Amino acid sequence: LSADGEIIVIHDETIDRTTNGKGFVNALSLRELKVFRINGEHTIPTLKEVFDLANQDCLINIELKSYDATEKVILLIEKYVTKKGWKYDQFLVSSFDWNALQQVAFLNDKIPIGVLTETNLDLALAFAKFIQAKSIHPHFHLLTKENTAQIQQKGLQVFPWTINEVEDIQKIKTFNVNGIITDFPNRI
């Protein structure tokens, strides 16, 4: 969230690496953030702007970076469902912050949830079952063809991250995952 409470779409907690500016996202207002540029031309988008740009043409995976943004993200999704004709299954809320995911499940159990994990696949699976998640998002090194099939047999989709090297992408595709999280979609 920006300093004035807007939902900002950016990977890091600062703008230092991805823009021509410096500072923490939560210390800058939306107006201040809009001054800075990504790759010299694009402004930092709000989540609403991303929804409008996507215009229902794709699944939107929203990774919650902070628990503080949870309720606002839920409210924005609900607005697009009730006022703009979107469907809940056009969204997927994921996070490493399992408290945030539990809050999503508690506040609106229609919103699909993806459980992110970097280390413990079994614990993530147990948590996913507990909150009735739709998918599991493990670091790709945790996956084998066998455990991918086992996860899917339990009714969960598998979206591994972040797979950027062509060789790794080709290998993971042989596991029959449901999707791949990458910085380079053109390599898929």
What name fits each language-model region?
Residues 1, 36, 65, 139, ...:
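Conserved residues at the C-terminal ends of beta-strands
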